[in-house]
């Protein structure tokens, strides 16, 4: 039964509770808690004063300190949920009194600030009310003070309950999380963006006359102008565009204008994608100059939102990163923001600076303009000093742990691509001890959770809680792993400072224990598991660098089962969509469905790729015994381009200098047809491979302008390089692939002025040149040109049939594929990034007498004894002539002037060799 309270009683209670936190708590306990039934039942028939009194008292009661909220417990959340779902004031927003709307929105802001993830079903009503209020009142300058502050409170609410995280500056995340909208919500977003733009333009127009660049450029006039004819335009002088200066301070004097501008501009950053490109505010030079002037404002919120507005395009627009001039203007103000106190909740200078460094580390790692600018200041040393102070704290609370995590992340970004910062950080001998302790603490927490999993599962079942919160230090340990990954990129650090078995042991333990979590503790829910799977991916990223050829810890990792752990993961349906889930794993499948695992897959393959770099054939077959070729090929069409890239790069290293593995790969792409031999009557197999067709189609699908897709294409090209290096029969298979030759032509034809399709990438060009090189190099002769001259094949001379009866070419272009081929010796593998090259591998293959027997993927064999070197030379000459016919000779000659030194040198060597072959008659 609802207890009725009069207006006077409500006001009396409200006045008695001001400043008394404990008295407020009493109203959440019986019997006083019955008052909430009255307060939540706001009827349309209630008078304005009664509605306002109920809203005021609700606001007073819910305005509790964190300690008092803990005392109240879940009942506080129940009241918030009831306010969201039971009150009907949102649906009648356009009909309500302006003061009632203001108090209601202010109450919602209080609730959203405490529980930002609590769903609010009536948000669309408030958006419609906001749009109507802006268009019908604000733009016509008819707003009362109550309506202005209501607009401000609405903007705050939209920021709090919006589904996007406004502090996320990572471009890939920004694109992935951009919501799919229906036609209705699409229109709603457009109207929201339009209303926000109207607010921004109306307020900014009041202060545009404050833009002043007179102290930068003198404007020459031909005759004096009367004061009445002078119009302030900061772009009257054409030299202004060339200056790096920022205009004088623009001061927003009106506090309502200041709040409206900062909140509207911040929210506009979320909806601006709805505005056509030519109408966006950031494309308006005058408005951009206005925002630059706001960087010097007295209002911290204005300065912070100006920074966000100016920096966001670097993460959301393709070519904006090239504008380093503007970035150099903004960076000092971003650095200065570290001293702002207090900072608005939606602004994190650590995250912004870290995201900028990461962005340029990916695009221009050797010339990061952010680090270059910071190097001219003492900012980095100040950050390191504060970082050391955080590490020296005897214990951490939630706030200090978050701050320390931010310091670790930004130090990881500093050290990711710059050796001097790695050495600077590693000079602190205690840093690695702190790192090891951070990893050990997380391992202990995981072990404790696994040991208590039965009790925890029972508790979650009884409380009907489907998701547990993540382990409290997940961000902390992830930051340490990122820092370790940055350190491990240094060759000298791997051989000296990081030569600690304990670090490798801790990495393996984290990987193993976290995988056990995914197998046994999936009941904890996605909120718990997502951070742990993210930690798995980062851990594998660090292990990638610890298993490189020159690392002292590679053997330790192998002895302690890194391949076995990866084999378990790659055969798990969670990480391999080609594997079927067992019938008894339905609960696990449902619990973990949708969790992103692409980083784990990509880095697992990357670890194997590094292990297979420059290794013996014996080691390759040991790997394939545990992780067979079929399992590797499961990831060749993965939805994530990064996974595909690592899969092709792994195949590149496996096929290098290994004829057997080349044949295994061809076997996996075989089409076999059985026919009757007309002479003997025996059944024979006619085999062909669709590997090249698959590779050609894959390259056509790839966009080399994307970094990961470019790496995938590079891997494919080097697989073809390795195929062409095996023997004459494999060369013949490659030379017949017209589509692949066309793709190579498209890559080699590009220049700096015409690079629309493939980006004029030097790595892709070099790979194409290596394919051509191996097609034309004699697989069975160590010194091809010397041998040709010794056999009388000097320029202008062609031996007749009488001189050499076996000089005819027996490997035809159009012959059907059949069994058997004459063996050829590998020669001249490229020294590319990950293409392994080992002379001993030739001996390994030569000792395998039965290697080529029954090989289906070769040309029709010549007669016994017809394997003369002249015969092979003839096939090489024919291949060279075909390359000339398709225009590749001209493209090779064109690339001798390429801007890349490696491409120029390879093109010159190849051109010289082709010229020699073309002289053979």
Curated annotation (Swiss-Prot):
Q: Name one GO cellular component term.
A: cytoplasm
SUPFAM superfamilies for this protein: ARM repeat (SSF48371)
Observed phenotype of the null mutant: Negatively affects glycogen accumulation.
Q: Which GO terms describe its biological process?
A: ascospore formation; negative regulation of gluconeogenesis; proteasome-mediated ubiquitin-dependent protein catabolic process; protein catabolic process in the vacuole
Its predominant location is nucleus
Q: Does the keyword Phosphoprotein feature in the UniProt annotation?
A: yes
Indicate, by first and last residue, each region the UniProt record lists as having compositional bias (Acidic residues): 829-855
What UniProt keywords apply to this chain's record, in alphabetical order?
A: Cytoplasm, Nucleus, Phosphoprotein, Repeat, Ubl conjugation pathway
Record InterPro entries: ARM-like, ARM-type_fold, ARMC8/Vid28
Q: Where are the ARM repeats?
A: 491-530, 551-592, 617-656, 683-725, 729-777
- Subcellular location per the Swiss-Prot or TrEMBL entry: Nucleus; Cytoplasm
Q: Which residues carry this modification: Phosphoserine?
A: 226
Locate the region Disordered. 822-867
Functional note:
Component of the GID E3 ligase complex recruiting N termini and catalyzing ubiquitination of proteins targeted for degradation. GID E3 is regulated through assembly with interchangeable N-degron-binding substrate receptors induced by distinct environmental perturbations. Required for the adaptation to the presence of glucose in the growth medium; mediates in association with the substrate receptor VID24/GID4 the degradation of enzymes involved in gluconeogenesis when cells are shifted to glucose-containing medium.
> How does it associate, per the subunit comment?
Identified in the GID/CTLH complex. In the absence of stress, the complex exists as an inactive anticipatory complex (GID(Ant)), composed of VID30/GID1, the E3 ubiquitin-ligase RMD5/GID2, VID28/GID5, GID8, and the RING-like subunit FYV10/GID9, awaiting a substrate receptor to form the active E3 ligase complex. When cells are shifted to glucose-containing medium, the substrate receptor VID24/GID4 is induced and becomes part of the complex, named GID(SR4).
What's this protein's family per the entry? Belongs to the VID28/GID5 family.
Official protein name in the record: GID complex subunit 5
């Amino acid at each position: 039964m609802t207890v009725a309270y009069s207006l006077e009683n409500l006001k009396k209670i409200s006045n008695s509770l001001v400043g008394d936190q404990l008295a407020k708590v009493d109203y959440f306990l019986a019997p006083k808690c019955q008052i909430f039934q009255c307060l939540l039942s706001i009827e349309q028939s209630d008078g304005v004063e009664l509605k306002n009194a109920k809203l005021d008292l609700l606001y007073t009661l819910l305005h509790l300190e964190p300690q008092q909220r803990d005392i109240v417990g879940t009942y506080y959340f129940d009241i918030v949920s009831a306010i969201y779902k039971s009150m009907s004031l949102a649906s009648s927003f356009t009909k309500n009194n302006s003061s009632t709307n203001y108090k209601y929105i202010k109450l919602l802001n209080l609730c959203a600030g405490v529980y930002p993830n609590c769903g609010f079903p009536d948000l669309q009503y408030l958006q419609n009310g906001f749009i109507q209020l802006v268009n019908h009142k604000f733009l016509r300058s008819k707003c009362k003070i109550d309506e202005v502050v209501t607009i401000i409170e609405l903007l705050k609410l939209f920021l709090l309950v919006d589904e996007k995280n406004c502090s996320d500056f990572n471009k890939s995340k920004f694109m992935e999380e951009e919501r799919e909208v229906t036609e209705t919500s699409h229109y709603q977003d457009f109207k929201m963006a339009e209303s926000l733009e109207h607010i921004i333009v109306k307020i900014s127009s009041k202060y545009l006359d404050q833009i002043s660049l007179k102290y930068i450029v003198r404007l020459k006039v031909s005759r004096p102008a009367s004061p009445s004819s002078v119009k302030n335009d900061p772009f009257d002088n054409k030299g202004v565009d060339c200056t790096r200066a920022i205009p004088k301070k623009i001061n927003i004097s009106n506090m309502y204008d200041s709040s409206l501008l900062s909140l509207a501009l911040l929210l506009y950053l979320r909806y601006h994608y709805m505005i056509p490109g030519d109408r966006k505010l950031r494309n308006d030079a005058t408005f951009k100059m206005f925002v630059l002037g706001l960087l010097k404002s007295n209002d911290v919120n204005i300065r912070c939102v100006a920074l966000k507005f100016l920096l966001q395009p670097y993460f959301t627009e393709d070519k904006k990163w090239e504008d380093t001039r503007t970035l150099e203007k903004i960076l000092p103000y971003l650095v200065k923001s570290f001293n702002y106190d207090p900072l608005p909740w939606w602004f994190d200078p650590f995250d912004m600076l870290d995201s900028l460094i990461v962005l340029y580390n990916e695009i221009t790692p050797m010339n990061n303009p952010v680090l270059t600018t910071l190097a001219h200041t003492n900012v980095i040393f100040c950050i390191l000093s504060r970082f050391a102070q955080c590490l020296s704290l005897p214990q951490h609370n939630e706030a200090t742990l978050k701050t320390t995590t931010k310091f670790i992340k930004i130090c990881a970004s500093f050290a990711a691509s710059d050796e001097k910062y790695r050495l600077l950080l590693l000079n602190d001998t205690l840093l690695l001890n702190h790192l090891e302790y951070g990893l050990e603490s997380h391992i202990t927490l995981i072990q404790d959770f696994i040991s208590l999993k039965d009790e925890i599962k029972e508790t979650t079942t009884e409380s009907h809680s489907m998701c547990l919160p993540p382990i409290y230090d997940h961000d902390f340990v992830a930051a340490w792993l990122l820092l370790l990954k940055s350190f491990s990129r240094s060759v000298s650090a791997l051989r000296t400072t990081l030569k600690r078995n304990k670090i490798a042991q801790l990495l393996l333990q984290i990987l193993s224990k976290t995988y056990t979590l995914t197998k046994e503790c999936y009941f904890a829910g996605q909120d718990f598991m997502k951070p742990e799977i993210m930690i798995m991916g980062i851990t594998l990223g660090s292990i990638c660098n610890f298993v490189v050829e020159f690392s002292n810890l590679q053997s330790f990792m192998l002895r302690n089962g890194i391949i076995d752990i990866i084999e378990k993961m790659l055969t798990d349906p969670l990480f391999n969509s080609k594997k079927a889930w067992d019938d008894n794993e339905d609960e696990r499948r449902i619990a973990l469905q949708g969790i992103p695992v692409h980083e784990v897959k990509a880095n697992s393959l990357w670890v194997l790729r590094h292990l297979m770099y420059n290794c013996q054939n014996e080691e390759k077959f040991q790997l394939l015994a545990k992780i067979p070729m079929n399992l590797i090929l499961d990831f060749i069409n993965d939805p994530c381009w990064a996974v595909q890239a690592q899969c092709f790069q792994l195949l590149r290293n496996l096929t290098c200098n290994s004829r057997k593995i080349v044949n295994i790969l061809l076997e996996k792409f075989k089409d076999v047809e059985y026919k009757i031999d007309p002479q003997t009557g025996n059944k024979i197999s006619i085999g062909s491979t669709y590997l090249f067709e698959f590779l050609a189609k894959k390259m056509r699908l790839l966009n080399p302008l994307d970094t990961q897709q470019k790496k995938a294409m590079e891997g494919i090209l080097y697989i073809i390089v390795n195929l062409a290096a095996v023997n004459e029969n494999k060369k013949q298979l490659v030379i017949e692939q017209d589509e692949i030759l066309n793709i190579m032509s498209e890559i080699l034809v590009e220049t700096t002025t015409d690079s629309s399709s493939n980006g004029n990438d030097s790595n892709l060009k070099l790979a194409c040149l290596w394919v051509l090189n191996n097609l034309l190099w004699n697989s069975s002769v160590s010194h091809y040109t010397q041998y040709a001259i010794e056999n009388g094949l000097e320029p202008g001379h062609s031996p007749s049939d009488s001189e050499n009866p076996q000089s005819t070419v027996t490997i035809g272009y159009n012959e059907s594929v059949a069994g058997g081929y004459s063996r050829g010796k590998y020669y001249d593998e490229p020294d590319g990034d990950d293409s392994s090259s080992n002379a001993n591998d030739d001996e390994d293959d030569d000792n395998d007498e039965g290697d080529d027997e029954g090989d289906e993927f070769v040309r029709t064999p010549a007669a016994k004894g017809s394997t003369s070197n002249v015969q092979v030379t003839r096939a090489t000459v024919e291949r060279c002539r075909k390359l000339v016919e398709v225009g590749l000779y001209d493209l090779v000659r064109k690339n001798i002037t390429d801007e890349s030194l490696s491409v120029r040198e390879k093109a010159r060597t190849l051109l010289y060799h082709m010229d020699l072959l073309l002289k053979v008659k």
